[in-house]
Amino acid sequence: MTKNIEDILGAYEEITDDLYDDLEEALIMGDVGMQTATDIVRELRKRVDAGEVRNPKHAKMVIADIVAKMIDGGEDMGLVTVPSIIMVIGVNGAGKTTTIGKMAAMYKAQGKKVILGAADTFRAAAIEQLEVWADRAGVELVKHKEGSDPAAVVFDTIEAGLARDSDIIICDTAGRLHNKKNLMEELAKIYRIIDKKLPYCDREILLVLDATTGQNAVNQAKEFMNVAEITGIVLTKLDGTARGGVVLTIKNELKIPVKFIGVGEKLDDLQPFKPDVFAKALFENTEETHKDEDDE
């Protein structure tokens, strides 16, 4: 996306309607949704008309500023209480298990006591995969056998977290969308348990999405929004320039903040999302490619 935008701006000596059209097309091709691309170009037009933009070269900095303002807000995790609970949802292959392991390692490195709950009980090998990541992160895992009631796992994880004075409880939950009624009932049961056991606690419900799937990730988010009260997004397999357009669409059209981005395979490759840094990287001259995570 970055290179296409630079090429377009470099091809024009002055700002014209054709430039606006080419710019909008480049944004859409870069995984920015049509509505968001239109919003960006409309705001650029307003600033040009107001005399804030001198030439196409200057427009690049202005577009970066528009994007930064568009994606700003809500990215901080609102976890203050002890304990706080994080529920993580997402389809198979998005990087959900990997994300949970990295998140556990991140909070542990901050000096927090973390416990994990393996409540995605219906996916083959999900429990074993989370066990591997718990070992890598050096945190405790609560698990039941495959096919167990997910809500029972969450209940036992909360009990264990309270008994061990844990700061952060992270539960791996729903990983499928094919039966929305069952998923809604499962999540509702989990919510009731949290409300009963931890009525005072801060909570986040994070949806893990694979950035390489582009607009499909946005559609997936819309589907999950119908069954879960999502408070934030984790975008995995994200190279800051090639797939960054998804971030803009999620924040602008779905009004869900991106909380974390996954940029590699290592345990410390989960980063808190920083809108200003991201917007700047999106429009830098050089492109840095990050290694993708595992598909777990």
Protein language model features and the residues they cover:
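Short acidic DE-rich linear segments
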Residues: T289-E296
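A general structural signal for well-ordered secondary-structure junctions
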Residues: D31-G33, I230, E288
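Short hydrophobic/aromatic residue motifs in ordered secondary structure
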Residues: M34-T36, R123, D239, L267
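Primarily NTPase-proximal linker/entry elements flanking Walker-type ATP/GTP-binding cores
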Residues: T2-A119, A126-C171
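Structured loop/turn residues at secondary-structure junctions
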Residues: A119-F122, E146, T212, L238
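Conserved catalytic-core segment of NTP-binding enzymes
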Residues: Q129, P150-R164, H178-E284
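Short glycine-rich anion-binding loops that position phosphate/pyrophosphate groups of nucleotides
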Residues: A174-R176
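Short beta-strand segments
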Residues: I89-G90, D172, V208, G262
